[in-house]
């Protein structure tokens, strides 16, 4: 699982060099979370998760404040949260999460990104059963044993705790996201390298080189769509 997260992290770091794109996606996600509940992260857990994620991407405060103020101002702009599932080359499994104000446009765009890159959209539930919703928290400056002790003392459960290069990665149930962070903050951890609610594949597949090239093009095409927030898959992209 650890190598899987590094796989995702490295890919995201490459793609998210386009800061304007990632900031725009966060702005939309923050607005939706703030609009659906209270615009206060203390009472709105969904908003708190998004803001914690935004910190790890260095999203500017101005973008965060603008999105929250837009929600406070009673903007009539509404977005639907939709999930698409599909297959890439060689049957690779893909989940695409979107926020859209035009369902027909988004469905057509996602379908085209699949079909133009040797993939195809599946029906609801066709691949999601092979993924687990997971909270992933990363930090530096502690060992895995130290993190385990901190979580045990706070009576917080984790699925797994792994050391990866200079970081420790904690994998937990989604509803433990805030509990894990709170326990670590209480032990002096001030910054997190990773703070995600993600879908992790239960097992990875390795593609032949030509299929992997095509698959990466498909993922890039999906991630470049304005309405797409997250793309999850079960392909080991290698180092």
Swiss-Prot record:
Q: Quick one: a GO cellular component term? A: cytosol
The molecular function terms of the Gene Ontology recorded here are: DNA binding
Keywords (A to Z) from UniProt? Cytoplasm, DNA-binding, Transcription, Transcription regulation
Among the GO biological process terms of this entry, one is: regulation of DNA-templated transcription
Q: Which Gene3D superfamilies match?
A: 1.10.10.200, 3.30.70.980
Where are the bilayer-spanning segments? none
Q: Which domain of life is it from?
A: Bacteria
Localisation: Cytoplasm
Q: Give the UniProt family note.
A: Belongs to the TACO1 family. YeeN subfamily.
- State the NCBIfam families in the record: PRK00110.1, PRK12378.1, YebC/PmpR family DNA-binding transcriptional regulator
Task: Report the PANTHER family cross-referenced here.
Answer: TRANSLATIONAL ACTIVATOR OF CYTOCHROME C OXIDASE 1
Name listed for the protein in its UniProt record:
Probable transcriptional regulatory protein BCG9842_B4761
* Classification of source organism: Bacteria, Bacillati, Bacillota, Bacilli, Bacillales
């Amino acid at each position: 699982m650890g190598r899987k997260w590094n796989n995702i992290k490295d890919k995201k770091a490459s793609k998210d060099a386009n800061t304007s794109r990632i900031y725009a996606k966060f702005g939309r996600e923050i607005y939706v979370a703030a609009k659906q509940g209270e615009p206060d992260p203390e009472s709105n857990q969904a908003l708190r998760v998004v803001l914690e994620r935004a910190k790890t991407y260095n999203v500017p405060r101005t973008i965060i404040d603008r999105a929250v103020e837009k929600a406070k101002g009673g903007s009539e702009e509404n977005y639907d949260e939709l999930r698409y599932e599909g297959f890439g080359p060689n049957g690779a499994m893909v989940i695409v999460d979107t926020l859209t104000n035009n369902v027909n446009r988004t469905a057509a765009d996602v379908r085209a990104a699949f079909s133009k890159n040797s993939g195809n959209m599946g029906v609801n539930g066709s691949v999601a059963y092979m993924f687990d919703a997971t909270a992933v928290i990363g930090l530096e400056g502690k060992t895995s044993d130290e993190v385990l002790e901190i979580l045990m003392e706070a009576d917080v459960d984790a699925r797994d705790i792994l050391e990866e290069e200079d970081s420790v990665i904690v994998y937990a149930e989604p509803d433990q996201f805030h509990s894990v962070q709170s326990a670590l903050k209480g032990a002096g951890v001030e910054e997190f390298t990773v703070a995600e609610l993600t879908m992790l594949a239960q097992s990875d597949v390795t593609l032949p080189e030509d299929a992997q090239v095509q698959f990466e093009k498909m993922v890039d095409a999906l991630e470049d769509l304005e309405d797409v927030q997250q793309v999850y898959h079960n392909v080991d992209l290698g180092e």
